[in-house]
Amino acid sequence: RTAAFNITGDFNLLGLDASFAAGVERREERGMDVPDPLQLAGLHGGNKVPLTVGEYSVNGYYGELLVPLVQDLPFAQEITFETAYRVDHYSTAGTVDATKFGISWVINDDVRFRGVLSESVRAPSISDLYSGQAQSYTSIGDPCAGVGGTNEANMNPVVVANCLSDPRIAATAAKGRFDVDQNITIPGFSYSQPQIQTISGFTGGNENLGEESADTTTLGLVWTPSYVEGLAVTLDYYEIEIEDVISSVSASRLINECYQSTNYPNASQCSAHTRFDSGHLRYWYSYGINQSRYETAGYDLAVGYTFEDLGPVPGELDIRGIVTMRDKHIYQTTSTSTPTDFVGEVGLNDEIARINFTWTTDDWLVSLQTNYYSDAQDDVTQAPGSYHLQAVDSYTYLDLQVRYDLTDSVDVYFGVDNLSDKQPPYCPNCKNEPNPGSHYTAESYARVWDSKFHYIGFRW
């Protein structure tokens, strides 16, 4: 449910026309995902699917201002400043705010510069906060394994002390474990294979999440030469840095940090596991926290031109192209982990280009789109000597669509995607390919098929 009040207007500032916008908003969001009884009970052929339900409310206020600074000066046909501020009070994440500062510098009818600096936030979603605990039967290592045994001297003494302060673990460690296969008693606290296999865990939401925050810089140049009518060229640079990105914290990390803490057992990480009466692990818990960092930068070059006169051929031809060149795409899981730049990996190719050729008349439209992906590596973290084993060549796909307008409100269309029937890359040694030795998944190259795809339809 949303209720909002907005106001806009113009005013005179030093003889120049400025404009403003302001408003308030009240928003209430509620979401739920209710699996059927079989899924809830885990009787549908898989693990239990949990119930997700949650809600939050937010009160927001914003203001925007657009102010021309100068007009009709040499090399400054117009310079305009814009700014915006917004503050939101979330019932979950608390108070967050966002700011924006921008400038537009029109040199003349042909050239314009633009730039924006902004700080923005993303509050956690209902899924982030309230997602139900889904069960997993993945085992994790127990940092207490080995205490009281022959290897205890090589263990972290803080971990040993914390583990033995649990009377359940201490009692089991003192007794040892009888190994039937070897017919011996293994000293200390250890696990048999069946005990390892009984460990299971749960992953879900975290109601204590905070907001993600982003700093964004964009700089752009627009060139629309008056002496070449119909031509438009834009070049934009972008840089985005996001802090406190919500990502899942592993159960192994949580339990290790618990027993390495000098605040055991009161450290918050210690609530992420439970044990049997014997001291052996029973359940682990994993959830999202604000821990990661993401940084990306690059360039977008767009060119468009319209041929309005095709001579004896009716209609007009519009050509639009955009090239994205990635400069960096860095992801850091935690503040103590090593950042990795993934530019050049499949899905984050150095260059991606799309060119559209569109011919139109009063009734017809024919569009041919080319999609280009530069060569890439399956895994940029691999050893350089293995690059040739996991290299994926550059790829180009062609898509065709034909549309005919039967009336002003009804049209029929026919299309062929992947016109040349080009198969996805084949990389038998790629470790990021979920089916080793097979074609790369469609998702990596924006495809949902492995061959030519035809479709037909109508709209009204």
Regions found by a protein language model. Give the residues of each.
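Residues that define the transmembrane beta-barrel architecture of outer-membrane proteins
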Residues: 55-61, 95-99, 203, 213-217, ...
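Structural signature of Gram-negative outer-membrane beta-barrels, strongest in the C-terminal barrel
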Residues: 49-153, 162-165, 199-228, 238-240, ...
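Extracellular loop and loop/strand-boundary signature of outer-membrane beta-barrel proteins
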Residues: 1, 45-53, 84-89, 204-207, ...
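C-terminal beta-signal and adjacent terminal beta-strands/loops
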Residues: 327, 370-381, 403-460
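Transmembrane beta-strands of outer-membrane beta-barrel pores
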Residues: 24-32, 69, 85-91, 117-123, ...
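Outer-membrane beta-barrel transmembrane domain signature of Gram-negative proteins
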Residues: 1-80, 292, 331-358, 369
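Gram-negative outer-membrane beta-barrel transporters
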Residues: 232-380
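Short loop/turn motifs that connect adjacent beta-strands in outer-membrane beta-barrel proteins
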Residues: 10-18, 70-79, 110, 152-156, ...
